[in-house]
């Protein structure tokens, strides 16, 4: 009985992402990285923790080609994969 009253109301309100935008890769600039990541996921039974290197490479490609806002890899959860190489920062 209570479900009949909910037909006219919207149950889902879309909202923008928390951080910036994630534009589509229309020109396929990072297609090879994406395919490598997706192949890894399929091969590893979709255990994304086993494909972190591929994920990092894909995100780095997107940042280098300005397909996403640049973020330090540490903030994206790749601190343990940084091999002791901090990102170069400009100091004025």
Swiss-Prot record:
SUPFAM superfamilies: Cysteine alpha-hairpin motif
PROSITE patterns reported for this sequence: CHCH
Skewed-composition ranges (Polar residues): 1-12
Motif (Cx9C motif 2): 51-61
UniProt modified residues of type N-acetylserine: 2
UniProt function note: Required for the transduction of an SCO1-dependent redox signal from the mitochondrion to ATP7A to regulate cellular copper homeostasis. May be required for the assembly of mitochondrial cytochrome c oxidase.
Name used for this protein in its record: Cytochrome c oxidase assembly protein COX19
Origin species: Mus musculus (Mouse)
């Amino acid at each position: 009985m209570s479900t009949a009253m909910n037909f006219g109301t919207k149950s889902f309100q879309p909202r923008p992402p928390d951080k910036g935008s994630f534009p589509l890769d229309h020109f396929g600039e990072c297609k090879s990285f994406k395919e490598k990541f997706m192949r890894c996921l399929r091969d590893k039974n979709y255990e994304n923790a086993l494909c972190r290197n591929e994920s990092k490479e894909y995100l780095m490609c997107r940042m280098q080609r300005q397909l996403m806002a640049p973020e330090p890899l540490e903030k994206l959860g790749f601190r343990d994969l940084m091999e002791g190489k901090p990102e170069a920062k400009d100091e004025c």
